[in-house]
């Protein structure tokens, strides 16, 4: 991620996010061009899979994948020494948890951490499983390890 390409994103003033019962841990985040988000997520996905393993109901399922993905993205910004985190969030629908990120155009893209795919724009036509109810910018999270 190149800070020269970043835009400061203030979620409190984003009208799209207000529709989804948002929770914000910080005042500002960085948005980046979509291509840079994809490159970061592609680079982090093997580490995510190595960390969480295969899908298992109730122990290693969608909420665990989305929270681990959030952790690895958050940690990459901390390790890079950036002054704030990327605009990457955990999102819940009625039946699923996944992630989303904000690009420099202000679009919010849904990301499926289980298969490393961009599902579509949060404002676009989505399957019910990806119809957001809640968005969460949790701030830095820590994974429990042995």
Model-derived regions, located:
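A structural boundary/capping signal
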Residues: 1-146
């Amino acid at each position: 991620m190149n800070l020269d390409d970043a835009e400061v994103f203030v979620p409190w003033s984003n009208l799209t996010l207000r529709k989804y019962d948002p929770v914000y841990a910080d005042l500002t985040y960085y948005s980046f061009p979509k291509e840079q988000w994809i490159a970061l997520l592609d680079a982090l996905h093997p580490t995510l899979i190595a960390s969480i393993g295969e899908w298992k109901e109730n122990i290693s399922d969608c909420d665990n994948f989305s929270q681990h993905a959030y952790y690895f993205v958050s940690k990459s910004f901390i390790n890079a020494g950036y002054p704030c985190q990327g605009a990457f969030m955990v999102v819940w629908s009625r039946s699923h948890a996944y992630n989303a990120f904000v690009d420099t155009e202000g679009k919010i893209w849904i990301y499926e951490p289980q298969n490393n795919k961009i599902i579509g724009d949060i404002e676009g036509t989505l399957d019910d499983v990806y119809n957001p109810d809640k968005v969460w910018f949790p701030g830095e999270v820590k994974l429990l390890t042995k």
